Amino acid sequence: MGLRSCTHLATLFMTLWALAFCFLVVVPIPAQTTSLQNAKDDRRLQELESKIGAESDQPNANLVGPSFSRFGDRRNQKTISFGRRVPLISRPMIPIELDLLMDNDDERTKAKRFDDYGHMRFGKRGGDDQFDDYGHMRFGR
C-alpha cells in the first residue's frame, strides 16, 4: 500500500507541475499585453496614415477634419526605441587628412601580387631565388 501511495503522489505532483507550467506559458503577463497593445496601436496608426496618404493622391478626397491633423503629424508616430536604420552620410573609416599622411603600401603589394603577364602569383615573395615568376617553387638551385 505504501508503494501505491507514493506513485499516486508522484503522478499527482507531475500533473500539477505540468498544469503550472502550462499556466505560466499560456497566460499572458500584463506588461507583455500592454506592450503588444501599444504595438498594435502603432501599426493601426501607420495603416491609417498610409490610407490617408493614398486618398490624398486622389483629386476628390475630402480630408478636412480633426482625424487628418491627428494622423498627419509625423512627430507623434516616431518610435523612440529604434535608431537610424541607414546612416545619413557614409564616411570613410579614416579621415581624408589622416589618409594623406599615412603611407599606404597598396601599390607596392599589388605589384608583387601579379607577374608581367597579369597572372596572380601564389606563394611567399620573400626571395626571388626561391620562387619563379609564376609562383612555383624552384628546387636544386
UniProtKB/Swiss-Prot annotation:
GO terms for biological process: adult feeding behavior; adult locomotory behavior; inter-male aggressive behavior; larval locomotory behavior; multicellular organismal response to stress; neuromuscular junction development; neuropeptide signaling pathway; positive regulation of cytosolic calcium ion concentration. Residues 34-73, 86-111 form a propeptide. The keyword Secreted applies. Pfam families: Sulfakinin. It is found in: Secreted. One of its GO terms (molecular function) is neuropeptide hormone activity. Residues 51-72 are annotated as: Disordered. The modification Phenylalanine amide is found at F82, F122, F139. Keywords: Amidation, Cleavage on pair of basic residues, Hormone, Neuropeptide, Secreted, Signal, Sulfation. One of its GO terms (cellular component) is extracellular region. Residues 1-33 form the signal peptide. The modification Sulfotyrosine is found at Y117, Y134. InterPro entries: Gastrin/cholecystokinin_CS (IPR013152), Sulfakinin (IPR013259). The keyword Secreted applies. Belongs to the gastrin/cholecystokinin family. Drosulfakinin-0 (DSK 0) plays diverse biological roles including regulating gut muscle contraction in adults but not in larvae. This is Drosulfakinins. The lineage of its organism: Eukaryota, Metazoa, Ecdysozoa, Arthropoda, Hexapoda. The gene is Dsk.
